[in-house]
């Protein structure tokens, strides 16, 4: 009898534990989704965030190596990039944010979207994959592509032509999917898409602009079909005819300065709402425009014409006590003065003389250079592109104050495109016009180009 009671008690205990486990496992934790439970519409927003950040981080790094911006002498990785002395790992951040933040989610998103016949999400997958891998081959040349994003921990590398042609093909496939009609019961693209806010026509126009952009890179590959890796001027014009036709078709991400409580999860721990160029540039010290950028904006090709964007791209500093004998190319507006450009190429390049140095500010002496070298005195006219923020940095405005938040005499404006809430222009009507003008000019149609 005692033995029988023990058996019965054991069975009851097993049943109790099983029922408890079943009772506790009634929901999927929304804060910790698995690969199986994550919704494809939720993945898209995550993918878009990390893809855009990878693109913008790459853009800032390449702008240094292309000669538009530099940093103060000895200013670390970015200074070295601007003088073509790159250190190992200079481009690892775009790689990491693309693969670890965005691309690792692509296949699962596509699989779930395909099961739901969510054509627009599948189209977004194709276009984003083409956009991201084209960036990778632009930066690295060879890269895992056909074998990437799978279970192979050591994927095979593809050459640049394979990646390029694959991206072009995926772009065409994505455009076809975006043009399909989804069932009304299928999750709308707007639920996960903050790039185009669910506007499939905007995606189609942006995708065609990307196609024109990609084919235009082949200018030195000889005439022929773009599907064979040749320069195809007619395909560019055909794509542009389906691309942005006005500024209303621009693909723009509008950032905010609300100090979002949602932060990225790749270790930077920064708010997801502000501009990625603010993260990598605007909030950081020491970046200065080069003479090449300055000349292109203020005297392009020696024609004496100033670009109307010059005052917004070149940074300004407030100077209540201007010195006598300021260089002639320093522009003033009241007590504000616009930055000069750092000479990076001639024999008088500051780099050969220990410059450029960062300007300092004191409430008694204003702007000054901490150096006994008289050749460095005019380095105060190289204004840094640093700005601030009201939300994230709790600053009174977007101006950076070198000597502290309350010292208005030390204000710096920053540059428009790297401020905290500056928009990200992923594709614009202006770019479409420039590409069209270039193609027509090279075809000999100068009147059409102009």
Residue map of PLM features:
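Conserved, well-structured interaction surfaces
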Residues: 41, 72-181, 417-424
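Membrane-proximal, proline-rich intrinsically disordered regions
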Residues: 3, 20-71, 85, 237, ...
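Bacterial N-terminal signal peptides that target proteins for export
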Residues: 1-8
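Short coil/linker segments at helix-helix boundaries
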Residues: 139-169, 179, 185-196, 201, ...
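Extended ligand-binding clefts on enzyme/binding-domain cores
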Residues: 229-429, 443
């Amino acid at each position: 009898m005692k033995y029988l009671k023990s058996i019965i008690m054991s069975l009851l205990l097993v049943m109790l534990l099983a029922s408890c486990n079943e009772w506790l496992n009634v929901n999927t934790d929304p804060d910790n989704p698995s690969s199986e439970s994550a919704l494809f519409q939720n993945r898209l927003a995550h993918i878009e965030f990390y893809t855009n950040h990878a693109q913008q981080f790459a853009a800032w790094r390449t702008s240094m190596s292309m000669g538009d911006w530099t940093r103060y002498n000895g200013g670390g990785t970015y200074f070295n990039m601007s003088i073509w002395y790159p250190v190992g790992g200079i481009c690892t951040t775009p790689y990491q944010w693309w693969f670890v933040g965005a691309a690792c989610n692509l296949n699962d998103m596509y699989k779930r979207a395909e099961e739901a016949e969510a054509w627009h999400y599948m189209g977004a997958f194709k276009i984003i994959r083409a956009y991201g891998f084209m960036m990778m081959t632009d930066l690295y040349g060879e890269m895992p592509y056909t074998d990437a994003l799978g279970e192979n921990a050591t994927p095979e590398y593809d050459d640049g032509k394979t990646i390029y042609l694959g991206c072009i093909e995926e772009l065409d496939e994505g455009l076809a999917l975006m043009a399909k009609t989804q069932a009304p019961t299928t999750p709308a693209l707007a639920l996960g898409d903050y790039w185009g806010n669910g506007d499939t026509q905007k995606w189609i126009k942006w995708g065609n602009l990307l196609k024109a952009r990609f084919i235009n890179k082949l200018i030195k590959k000889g005439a022929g079909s773009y599907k064979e890796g040749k320069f195809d001027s007619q395909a560019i014009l055909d794509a542009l005819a389906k691309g942005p036709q006005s500024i209303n078709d621009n693909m723009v991400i509008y950032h905010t300065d609300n100090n979002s409580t949602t932060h990225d999860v790749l270790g930077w721990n920064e708010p997801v709402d502000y501009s990625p160029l603010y993260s990598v540039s605007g909030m950081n010290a020491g970046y200065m425009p080069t003479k090449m950028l300055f000349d292109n904006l203020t005297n392009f090709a020696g024609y004496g014409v100033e670009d109307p964007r010059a005052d917004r791209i070149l940074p300004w500093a407030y100077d209540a006590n201007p010195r006598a004998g300021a260089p002639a190319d320093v522009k003033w507006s009241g007590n504000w003065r616009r930055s000069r450009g750092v000479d990076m190429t001639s024999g008088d390049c500051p780099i050969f003389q220990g410059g450029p140095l960062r300007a300092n500010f004191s409430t008694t002496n204003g702007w000054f250079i901490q150096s006994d070298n008289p050749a460095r005195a005019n380095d105060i006219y190289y204004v840094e592109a640093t700005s601030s923020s009201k939300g994230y940095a709790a600053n009174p405005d977007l101006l950076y104050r070198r000597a502290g938040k309350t010292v208005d005499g030390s204000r710096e404006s920053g540059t428009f495109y790297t401020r905290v809430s500056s928009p990200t222009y992923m594709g614009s009507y202006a770019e479409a016009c420039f590409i069209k003008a270039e193609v027509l000019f090279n075809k000999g149609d100068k009147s059409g180009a102009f």
